[in-house]
Amino acid sequence: MEVKVFRVKGVFERLGKKQPFTKEYRALKQEHVKELVYSEIGSKHRVPRTKIWIESIEEIKPEEAEDPIVRKLSLEL
């Protein structure tokens, strides 16, 4: 299986305020990315999954990645 690069956009609510986010991940499937988003944002910001809304998950080319770590890992292969 091939590892793909995904860009996730969404919003989470913390202390009554909505905070937009954009994250990039390397994963095999969209379902894995969704779980990573819930896990990372929930852990880092202490937000329950019900307060995290994922608006879009799109597969992108490794060259389009804005996160330097994701780009470097993807292009080294």
Swiss-Prot record:
Protein's GO biological process: translation
UniProt key word RNA-binding: yes
Pfam families assigned: Ribosomal_L18A
Domain of life: Archaea
One GO CC term, this protein: ribosome
UniProt key word rRNA-binding: yes
Protein name, as recorded: Large ribosomal subunit protein eL20
Organism of derivation: Thermococcus onnurineus (strain NA1)
Gene: rpl18a
